Swiss-Prot record:
Disordered as annotated region, ranges: 93-133, 860-880
A Pfam family recorded for this sequence: Ubiquitin_DCDC1
Source species taxonomy: Eukaryota, Metazoa, Chordata, Craniata, Vertebrata
PROSITE patterns in UniProt: DC, RICIN_B_LECTIN
UniProt name for this protein: Doublecortin domain-containing protein 1
Location(s) in or outside the cell: Midbody, Midbody ring; Midbody; Cytoplasm, Cytoskeleton, Spindle
Residue spans of biased composition, Low complexity class: 117-131
Signal peptide positions on this chain: none
SUPFAM superfamilies per the UniProt record, alphabetical: Doublecortin (DC) (SSF89837), Ricin B-like lectins (SSF50370)
Protein function: Microtubule-binding protein which plays an important role in mediating dynein-dependent transport of RAB8A-positive vesicles to the midbody during cytokinesis.
Amino acid sequence: MAKTGAEDHREALSQSSLSLLTEAMEVLQQSSPEGTLDGNTVNPIYKYILNDLPREFMSSQAKAVIKTTDDYLQSQFGPNRLVHSAAVSEGSGLQDCSTHQTASDHSHDEISDLDSYKSNSKNNSCSISASKRNRPVSAPVGQLRVAEFSSLKFQSARNWQKLSQRHKLQPRVIKVTAYKNGSRTVFARVTVPTITLLLEECTEKLNLNMAARRVFLADGKEALEPEDIPHEADVYVSTGEPFLNPFKKIKDHLLLIKKVTWTMNGLMLPTDIKRRKTKPVLSIRMKKLTERTSVRILFFKNGMGQDGHEITVGKETMKKVLDTCTIRMNLNLPARYFYDLYGRKIEDISKVPLLEKCLQNSITPLRGLLWVSKGEGFSPSGAKMYIQGVLLALYQRLKSAKKYYKQLNLVMNEQKEKITEKVILSMTAKEHHKEQEEVSRLIDELQTAIKSNIGHLCKLGPQLQAEQEQFSSYVYQHIKSLPANTLVPGGLQLKVFENGKNTGEISVGISKKDLGSDSPIQTDHMMERLLLKIHQRLQGSSINPPGLNYSSMRLFDENGQEIKNPLSLKNEQKIWVSYGRAYRSPLNLALGLTFDRVSAFARGDIMVAYKTFLDPNAVLLPGCGNWEVCEGFPINFNCTSQQIPDQFEKVDLENHFLQNKVDPNIVLHASVSIGKWSFSGSEASSRSQIAPSILWPVASVWLITKTGMILSRAITQGCLAIGHPIRVKAAEGTSLEGYKLILQKRHSGDDSQKWVFGTDGCIYSKAYPQFVLTYLEELNAQVDVTQTEYHIHHGAWTTAHQEHGRNLAEEVLQESASNLGLKQLPEPSDTHLMPEGSLEETGELTVALVRKLEEKHPKASAQRWAIKHEGTSKPGQWKHSRVENPLWNKLTYMWPVLPSGQLNEEFDWPIQGLLVPSSPPMKKPICKTTEPYAPVRLRVLQNGEKNKNRSVTILGPDISPGRKTQCTEILNLPSAARRLYNEKGKEIFALKDLQRDELVYVSCGELWINPDLSIAQQKKQIFLRNLESDIAKIQIFCSTHKIEALVLEVQSDIVSGSKLAVHKPVAIFGEEKQVTEPEEKQMQEDPLTTENASSEILDSHVRAHLRMKACHTLPRYAWQETSHDFDEDDSLPKKTEKGLFENVEPQKKHSCSPKHSKLHKHCHQQFEYRDGQIISHAAPQLVLGVQGPNLRSGMEVVLVEKKSDGSHQRWIHQEDSRTFHLVSNPDLVLAVSMTKTRNEVCGYPVIVQKYKPYNNGAANQKWHYMKNIKALVAFHSTALDKEITSANYAGVCTSSVIKEENIDQPGYCYLSPDGKRKTMLCLACGQSMRTEKGLKQLLPGVPFLCISGTKTQKPFLQGPFKVISVAEVDLSCDKAEKTLSYYQARLLSLRMKTCTQAASHSGMAATHQKAVKIIAYKNGDGYRNGKLIVAGTFPMLLTECTEQLGLARAASKVYTKDGTPIFTLRDLVLWALDESFLQRDSEKQKQDAAPVGKEQIIVEKNPRMKVKNRLFAKSVTSDSLDGIDKSLLTLILRNPIAIWVSCGEPFLPPNALQKAEKLEKQNWLKKDRILADLDTMRHKMRQLKGRRVAACQPATMVPTKSPVQPVVVEGGWTEQTQQEIKLMELIRHTEAHLSEIQEMESKINFPIATKRIAVKPSNLYKQPNTKRVWIYLNGGRPEDGTYAWGKTISELLQDCSSRLKMTHPARALYTPSGEPIQSWDDIERDMVICVSMGHGFKTPKELKQLMEIRANYARIRRQQGPQATDIVVSPSTKLLSLAHLHN
């Protein structure tokens, strides 16, 4: 019963709920008659339902209605609650722009957590959906329902009471939900105290594009005060616009949905509402601007009439259209020209006509026709093909149209039974008539088009006939054939490296077309093309060039010489590319160890240790565990008593040695030296390889410990230590004390093994703090041999001397038996017979411990060091270094101490790395900015231009970004402008030296071309250059065609990664000595042979030149015999002469003895071929292989570690072809890379190369494995094969090697134009003309003779030579050397003639001038680094000076020591005569003590004139030297004449630099003394003050008669004593004197040769004179202005005129307010200035009014005539009457 009652009760409640819901819907309809829902409407619904009905008793329909309404409102109106008074806990809130609401504040007890909140809701019978009820606790809580808040409100009334009390206690806070104006989706919760902060927060949180300015409530009312905003209200924030109702769009949308119905046919819109027309977003003007005016054009390939391409072309340049056609039509070359139907070139794409209307196939009109050419001429066959196809199509359409027209006529004739087209029968009469007119019009159009195309075909008749007669040559009529004597250089294969690196090789192929130009003889243009080609190839590579700027690109060879002529490049040459920077060697200097084998022999109790040969098999055991460091020579060494060897080098027995633990008889001695090391690998080349030595891979790596020890990474038991004292002689003659560096066994308490790293980059010795580690080679210092150990080296003595040396050593040992304390061998009695340089180890020391130099010493960098990380362990160590100079981080250098001098604890100690000398300064260099120049107007001309009227005016320097391209673009130069010259040919470096409107010549980098020079002389120079290039090819062939037997060997150490090469075998080394003498005799006979060979083709005049040159060149230093017989009156300093003539001695290169070299190389040349691998016999774990996954031809073969599965290290030996094929790629074989410049030391490198299956021309791929001696012999082939291979690599035609014989060789072929004859070319000829003809490579097995060498060759087949004819060159085995000598003599003859003609302009022939000995110095260097030059002509003197002095540009000026400019050798000889007589007269004047009178003063003022008059009074004039006694001239000219050479800069006296340095040093010493005295006086002052204060003596009271101050205090400890007062005055006087000295120092301007701008003192607080301002025209807007610079008002006015492009010069300046500027002081930096041409100040508004007045005036005169403006103004009658009354 109870259950039934409960059910009845529930049913009653359900009925009541339905009734309540019905009432709610009625309320809804009444409140919203339009059926829309908004926030105000839904509010009473929720209140009505939730207040009167518990949700537990709601029916399912009611719950569904509430949930649907809730979800709808949630999605439409945002996440905020609908009722503003809903209960929300204090901690609840919304994150910015979030759709989730967080739980309530956990710090309060109202709602503890989310679980309690859910349980309360469940107990209160508030229904929650299953998806939300079953959500995990960690998931974010969704938007809370309004029903849940309401239930919470009913449930916890007590909590609400507490909450309201809390609100009463809190201050007034604006807590709202802010929405973007007009939106309900972009919102944020904001809590702020004021309206201003509310606007700021809303600007940031709502991401408004402008600052928030206004706040609106939900009803649209604007809130101005915080009290206007209710708590927890919804507000709308705008940026200034009025309120936008966000519900308006929703309301309209709901209204539209109400009136729209769904039907079976789709959506039905209301019929009573008129649909408005859709308005476009863009305006008509914007549509015109944005729409793309493009046309469709029909393109065909040249010579084709089918497969056309319709390409849409817009308003683009012709170049872009050509590029589009190249891509769309898939052309193999870029498109160059467009031709129309008649073969005319199209220059404007917009003028292409439309096709006939009947040929249009779309609504968009089609234009055409155009034929695309790749550079060839127009081919009419393509137009013919197209017209024939069009005519065929037109005839078919005309036939069908006429047939259809007949069908239409049958209707008119009422013959419907004959009509076959059913469409016609269904037409009405009107449609029939219209169709008949259209078909008739179509027939007329077709007939007209047919007639037009037939006419086109008739006009093409002559062109078609010419093409049929001339075949394919018709389209190449515009190409002119080159003369027979010109030839573009052949192809090159270059190996490009990045500057400063020797890895990352990039192979670049350069063909003849890449270097070709309209004038092939222009090397400058070819160089530009070469740079561009290399730059394009490097794009995207590891070198990564910056952008497209290749104007600063520079190329260098292996020697660091810049490459400026592409003709000097050779195939397979290595080059280094740089972008604007100087050459950096890929090998870097580092401190390392060199190990030498040591042996000993004993006789009696005396033992002598000496260096001997190394046994590589025993020594190559790197690692600390195999060696032990011994202090002194090992005792357990088995000494020998054999005879002393012919040459030996003694080693001190007290040194530390390395002894092998396995074999005690293997003892090594380590030497410390500087070597060249590659950071990228273990490759090294020691600079001081005294004896054959072995460098371990880690011999240059050191470990720096915290205690200051520097340990060797190779031998960790040994450390860097101080050796015996030495004395070092610097280049300037000064002697420095020092100590030798050695490797010792480490001891923790030894200070001589500890080092201190300073904050200046120096490494100090702890035992001798005043000495630092020094790189001697940079210091240009040599070790004084008298203070070092003694070494004997008899290798260069004769046999008698060797025997004497052996006996002498035996005597030494016998005499030493009685003296056990003797430690060093005595010096032999005949040491003067020993060759210079025999004291080799200490004489060539590269590093030592030397006394610290001054900080400003020019060679101070020799004592700076850096640590370069090496190895794979501890990477990134350099990042912990703390050095101010950013260059250290760029070079990844590190230093172990901080700038404060403390150890850097951030390092992972010990530090491992290389010790690099000559490091950059540790402090950041101070960059001085140069003063900006004022703009100068110049007239520019292209280099060599003769017509000065073609000059163009420019303004320079321009500040715009395009300033560098001004001259390039205006003069239309082929490449970027780089150098400037004046009218006299002097190069310009600074524009400040130029005058206004001065004429300047612009070049692209080449030297100045004299406009007066004849073209014939230029052609002669070009001919000589081409002839030299041809002779160079022949010379390369002659040096390589007789390739001797070469074997495979390892270049450096036998370690993994070592490179391989082919070199002379050690087995035939004994024969070299026998071969040497005949070669020397042959070399001595060569000049005679050359002279005899040239006598047939040279005239007597040139033969005399040749003999004279041979006399000077054969005895290279013939003048040295008399070089020491100088007179006392010599003009050069004695020290300079001594150093100079000592350096002239030829430097003898140290070479190892034959026996030692044989043992050293024997293991490097032994290999075994076993199990498909080529194994090193010395190290069986290493085999030949190729590194890298991507195999390609040209990769180097190196030693790699042996692996069983390595396919890149297995080879297949094919004995029939004598080749070794790589297993991973059988097309690649082991080959020798035949570079054109063979390295005699390293030989030819070994690479993998694509297999060439030819009988001849592939000798570098043929090998012979000699199993008995374990050697691989290269070039194992016939002599003919070697000669053809050498010819191919030298670029010589093979027909000059073999005469009238067909052989199998690599080559090319091409077909004749008629396709009947096949022409065959060799490899060199084919590469030289590959781009001109369609060459195809010949298959193997086709014997042929190159067509270039036959007598029936065509004129254009010049071959690989530029000048020489291939048919006239005979390079067969026995005539190659004679041919080379013949052409060399011919080249020499032509050069002599050219030099003679060039020197004839001075009035006397060059042959009449005797060669003069000259000492050349660089201008500004004083007497440093002089070079001896013997020259016969002045141009030869300038050339030699440029090369030997290493000048950056060509030498152009020569000065003597007194500044006299020299222009010819005759002037130099005359000056030398004058100088010699001047010195003799001065000596006589000193001897004759005459009274000083007026005459003597006059003579002293001009002594040279007096001597000249005395010398040449009778016998000689200034234009001739014939009258001078030859013996006197020879006596004077026996000593070299000192000259100073410059590149155009003015003369600097030789002693100016020394004087400046001396004066600076004196000032420094003087200032140091003053500072020391000042410090002493200040210290004394402090002492006096301290004593006075410490004494605390009381003051005395002295009575006075003054009533104001009856007692005066005197004395006491607070008053200064008289001594202190005097000392203070002295201190002030000294400080004033010091400031005067410093001020004088700042004003001194030292002359420096390399700088043109004097060093000026820079003051931090002094503003520069030049000011930058913002200028604009008078009457204009300031925004339209620009910047201007100036030092004065006049200069600023001039700059304003040029920058604003004013029609008249600027005359007045105003401020923006209209105030005139009169003084320069009124102008400030970045000031806005109005510029006027003389008129008064005008604002933009006034200027506009003035323009309107002028426009009205002109309009009236145009419309009503000139008389309309003839206005006479007269006073009014009223004014006249008033004036009359007044009178």
